Curated annotation (Swiss-Prot):
SUPFAM superfamilies: Electron transport accessory proteins. Belongs to the PsaE family. Keywords: Membrane, Photosynthesis, Photosystem I, Thylakoid. GO terms for biological process: photosynthesis. This is Photosystem I reaction center subunit IV. One of its GO terms (cellular component) is plasma membrane-derived thylakoid membrane. It is found in: Cellular thylakoid membrane. Pfam families: PSI_PsaE.
């Protein structure tokens, strides 16, 4: 499927906060690790620090858990 940096992708990992959301690939690691694609999203997740806005807006996924949007 050859996902590369800058591609817009849809997340297909059902347990992910960003399931079926579209994000932009920030980097792809070619060293052989399982979750080699770092994807950046516009919205943040629920993991913010208590009393502050925000949370994480990136996550690692395997190429098999992504499809080009």
């Amino acid at each position: 499927m050859a996902i590369s940096r800058g591609d817009l992708v849809r997340v297909k990992r059902p347990e992910s906060y960003w399931y079926n959301e579209i994000g932009k690939v920030a980097s792809v690691d070619t060293s052989g690790i399982k979750y080699n694609c770092v994807v950046r999203f516009d919205k943040v997740n629920y993991a913010g620090i208590s009393g502050t806005e925000g949370g994480a807006n990136t996550n690692n996924f395997a190429e098999s858990e992504l499809e080009k949007a």
